[in-house]
Amino acid sequence: MKLTMVLSVAFATLTFANEGILTFEGLGLARRQTICHTPGGSGCRASISGDQCCCTSCTPEDCSDLCKNGKQAAHEAQKQKKCAKCCNAGGESHELCCSIASAGIDCNPCTAGLRMC
Protein backbone atom coordinates (compact mmCIF):
# COMPACT_ATOMS: atom_id res chain seq x y z
CA MET A 1 0.00 0.00 0.00
CA LYS A 2 2.79 2.43 0.86
CA LEU A 3 4.55 1.59 -2.39
CA THR A 4 1.37 2.30 -4.34
CA MET A 5 0.99 5.70 -2.70
CA VAL A 6 4.63 6.57 -3.32
CA LEU A 7 4.35 5.61 -6.98
CA SER A 8 1.10 7.56 -7.35
CA VAL A 9 2.69 10.69 -5.91
CA ALA A 10 5.79 10.22 -8.08
CA PHE A 11 3.81 9.91 -11.31
CA ALA A 12 1.55 12.82 -10.41
CA THR A 13 4.59 14.99 -9.68
CA LEU A 14 6.21 14.06 -12.99
CA THR A 15 3.02 14.81 -14.90
CA PHE A 16 2.48 18.23 -13.36
CA ALA A 17 6.16 19.13 -13.60
CA ASN A 18 5.97 18.83 -17.38
CA GLU A 19 3.43 21.54 -18.18
CA GLY A 20 3.62 20.74 -21.91
CA ILE A 21 1.64 17.58 -21.22
CA LEU A 22 -1.24 19.65 -19.87
CA THR A 23 -1.49 21.99 -22.86
CA PHE A 24 -3.05 21.41 -26.25
CA GLU A 25 0.32 21.99 -27.93
CA GLY A 26 1.90 19.35 -25.71
CA LEU A 27 -0.35 16.66 -27.16
CA GLY A 28 0.97 14.52 -29.96
CA LEU A 29 -0.25 14.99 -33.53
CA ALA A 30 -2.31 11.79 -33.45
CA ARG A 31 -4.09 12.85 -30.25
CA ARG A 32 -4.75 16.38 -31.53
CA GLN A 33 -6.24 14.95 -34.72
CA THR A 34 -8.75 12.88 -32.75
CA ILE A 35 -10.00 15.72 -30.51
CA CYS A 36 -10.15 18.54 -33.05
CA HIS A 37 -13.12 19.54 -35.15
CA THR A 38 -11.90 19.84 -38.72
CA PRO A 39 -13.76 20.58 -41.92
CA GLY A 40 -15.13 17.66 -43.89
CA GLY A 41 -13.42 16.29 -46.92
CA SER A 42 -10.46 14.11 -47.61
CA GLY A 43 -6.74 14.60 -47.51
CA CYS A 44 -4.70 16.81 -45.22
CA ARG A 45 -6.73 19.73 -43.86
CA ALA A 46 -6.58 22.10 -40.91
CA SER A 47 -8.94 24.08 -38.72
CA ILE A 48 -7.65 27.18 -36.93
CA SER A 49 -9.34 28.74 -33.92
CA GLY A 50 -7.36 31.47 -32.20
CA ASP A 51 -3.94 30.07 -31.42
CA GLN A 52 -5.07 26.46 -31.76
CA CYS A 53 -4.58 24.67 -35.03
CA CYS A 54 -5.98 21.20 -35.62
CA CYS A 55 -5.04 18.91 -38.50
CA THR A 56 -6.64 15.80 -39.93
CA SER A 57 -4.90 13.19 -42.08
CA CYS A 58 -1.61 15.13 -42.15
CA THR A 59 2.02 14.40 -41.55
CA PRO A 60 3.60 16.55 -38.82
CA GLU A 61 5.39 18.61 -41.50
CA ASP A 62 2.21 19.19 -43.54
CA CYS A 63 0.30 20.11 -40.39
CA SER A 64 2.97 22.59 -39.38
CA ASP A 65 2.95 24.22 -42.83
CA LEU A 66 -0.85 24.39 -42.98
CA CYS A 67 -1.09 25.90 -39.51
CA LYS A 68 1.65 28.45 -40.17
CA ASN A 69 0.11 29.58 -43.47
CA GLY A 70 -3.41 29.52 -42.03
CA LYS A 71 -2.45 31.69 -39.07
CA GLN A 72 -0.80 34.19 -41.42
CA ALA A 73 -3.96 34.29 -43.54
CA ALA A 74 -6.09 34.79 -40.42
CA HIS A 75 -3.81 37.65 -39.32
CA GLU A 76 -4.11 39.27 -42.76
CA ALA A 77 -7.91 38.94 -42.63
CA GLN A 78 -7.88 40.63 -39.21
CA LYS A 79 -5.85 43.51 -40.66
CA GLN A 80 -8.36 43.89 -43.50
CA LYS A 81 -11.22 43.90 -40.99
CA LYS A 82 -9.45 46.64 -39.03
CA CYS A 83 -8.94 48.56 -42.27
CA ALA A 84 -12.65 48.37 -43.15
CA LYS A 85 -13.64 49.45 -39.65
CA CYS A 86 -11.27 52.42 -39.89
CA CYS A 87 -12.64 53.56 -43.25
CA ASN A 88 -16.23 53.21 -42.11
CA ALA A 89 -15.53 55.25 -38.98
CA GLY A 90 -14.12 58.35 -40.62
CA GLY A 91 -15.00 58.21 -44.30
CA GLU A 92 -11.39 58.66 -45.39
CA SER A 93 -9.99 57.07 -48.53
CA HIS A 94 -9.52 53.32 -48.52
CA GLU A 95 -5.79 53.58 -49.35
CA LEU A 96 -5.10 55.99 -46.50
CA CYS A 97 -7.07 53.97 -43.97
CA CYS A 98 -5.45 50.69 -44.93
CA SER A 99 -1.96 52.13 -44.71
CA ILE A 100 -2.77 53.51 -41.25
CA ALA A 101 -4.47 50.31 -40.03
CA SER A 102 -1.76 48.03 -41.44
CA ALA A 103 0.92 50.03 -39.66
CA GLY A 104 -0.92 49.52 -36.40
CA ILE A 105 -1.52 53.26 -35.97
CA ASP A 106 -4.76 54.66 -34.55
CA CYS A 107 -7.37 54.62 -37.31
CA ASN A 108 -8.39 58.20 -36.67
CA PRO A 109 -6.18 60.30 -39.00
CA CYS A 110 -6.46 63.28 -36.65
CA THR A 111 -5.02 61.43 -33.66
CA ALA A 112 -2.55 59.60 -35.91
CA GLY A 113 -0.91 62.96 -36.58
CA LEU A 114 -2.14 63.42 -40.13
CA ARG A 115 -3.29 66.94 -40.99
CA MET A 116 -6.52 66.35 -42.81
CA CYS A 117 -9.14 67.24 -40.23
From Swiss-Prot:
Residues 1-17 form the signal peptide. InterPro entries: SnTox1_CBL. It is found in: Secreted. Disruption phenotype: Impairs pathogenicity on differential wheat lines harboring the Snn1 gene. Induction: Expression is induced in planta during disease development and peaks at 3 days post-inoculation correlating with the onset of necrotic lesion development. Expression is increased in the absence of toxin A (ToxA). One of its GO terms (biological process) is effector-mediated activation of plant hypersensitive response by symbiont. Disulfide bonds join 36-87, 44-55, 53-58, 54-98, 63-83, 67-117, 86-97, 107-110. Keywords: Disulfide bond, Secreted, Signal, Virulence. Residues 87-117 are annotated as: Chitin-binding domain. One of its GO terms (molecular function) is pathogen-derived receptor ligand activity. Pfam families: CBL (PF18973). GO terms for cellular component: extracellular region. Its main location: secreted. Interacts with host cell wall-associated kinase receptor Snn1. Necrotrophic effector that plays a critical role during fungal penetration, via its interaction with the host Snn1 protein. Snn1 is a member of the wall-associated kinase class of receptors, which are known to drive pathways for biotrophic pathogen resistance. Recognition of Tox1 by Snn1 induces mitogen-activated protein kinase genes such as MAPK3 and activates programmed cell death, which allows this necrotroph to gain nutrients and sporulate. Recognition of Tox1 by Snn1 also induces other plant defense responses, including oxidative burst and pathogenesis related (PR) gene expression. The host Snn1 gene confers susceptibility to strains of the necrotrophic pathogen Parastagonospora nodorum that produce the Tox1 protein. This is Cysteine rich necrotrophic effector Tox1. It comes from Phaeosphaeria nodorum (strain SN15 / ATCC MYA-4574 / FGSC 10173) (Glume blotch fungus). The lineage of its organism: Eukaryota, Fungi, Dikarya, Ascomycota, Pezizomycotina. The gene is Tox1.
